Regions:
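Inter-helical turn/loop segments and adjacent helix faces that build the functional surface
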Residues: 14-19
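"A position-specific structural signal for the A-helix of alpha-solenoid helical repeats
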Residues: 10-13, 68
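Structured, solvent-exposed acidic/aromatic patches
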Residues: 1-10, 59-63
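CBM-like carbohydrate-recognition segments
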Residues: 22-141
Length: 141
């Protein structure tokens, strides 16, 4: 996932700098491949809907992927990748994976397990993704 996010973000930045279509095409191809590989259709009882969600690996890897999807969204306006992240984060927050006392999110954020200890790197990644989503919301995007 992070191995897709970083080159996708780089391709977007190169497109912004050069305007060369090949970089945008590359970013879009990486996005399609990453989405196909790292997202799964999920039926959420918490949200009452089906959506494509992150497969549930370590959040830091997905935060890097999310950066790439955000850069691409700024260029092509395709929101389905961002929406998948948005719903994935909402699912994690609304489910049993969130510790109701501390609001920390479990490493197992789609299977509903809670932890007795947490990793700073993991929690930081969640904060980053949630903050980036909040900025989009404030901007009306």
């Amino acid at each position: 996932s992070y191995n897709s996010g970083q080159p996708m973000q780089a391709a977007c930045l190169l497109y912004n700098i050069t305007g060369e279509q090949q970089y945008l095409n590359e970013a879009q191809q990486i996005a399609r491949s990453a989405y196909s590989k790292w997202f799964t259709l999920y039926d959420s009882k918490e949200l009452g809907e089906k959506f494509y969600r992150i497969n549930g690996d370590h959040a830091w890897f997905y935060s890097v992927l999310f950066r790439g999807f955000l850069e691409l969204y700024k260029i092509d306006g395709r929101r389905d990748y961002v929406t998948a992240f948005e719903k994935s984060m909402l699912q994690a927050w609304m489910s049993e994976c969130r510790n109701q006392t501390t609001n920390l999110l479990s490493n197992n954020y789609f299977i509903g397990k809670t932890n007795s200890s947490w990793q700073v790197l993991h929690e930081g990644a969640f904060v980053e993704m949630l903050a980036r989503l909040a900025v989009l919301e404030l901007e009306g995007k």
